[in-house]
């Protein structure tokens, strides 16, 4: 148990790294860096090609390394335009993170992409596409609790992402 008069001892603790053996070897050095995203201000309507391009320009001007393209990019931007957006970002020194719905029987949230992260074959296919197109990472959202099945999904996503050198943000989770 870690306690303190402030959050510092909890946030700064190294106990997990001191007592748990590393189970997997990282495929690369993962460094998130600074980033921005449009959803915090514009929500779903902001997930379009032109707005994301403006955010890439903003990130480049600020010296940020990433832009998170949030929910609905698969339908409001589409895969071909996302490839174009990723190339544009690279030309500005900015990498992209893409939002994904975790899906499964626990999740009926309509935002997409859906039906990918809970399916090993589709997930690995998507990650191969991301790797090919220089996508830096994913934000996976709407997890359904903290049962063993969900913990296994976290681990499966992390294992596959590591195989493809994809960084991961878990959101809406334990």
Regions found by a protein language model. Give the residues of each.
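Aromatic- and carboxylate-enriched substrate-binding clefts and catalytic-loop regions
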Residues: 71-174
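Conserved structural scaffold segments of CAZyme catalytic domains across common CAZy folds
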Residues: 1-97, 103
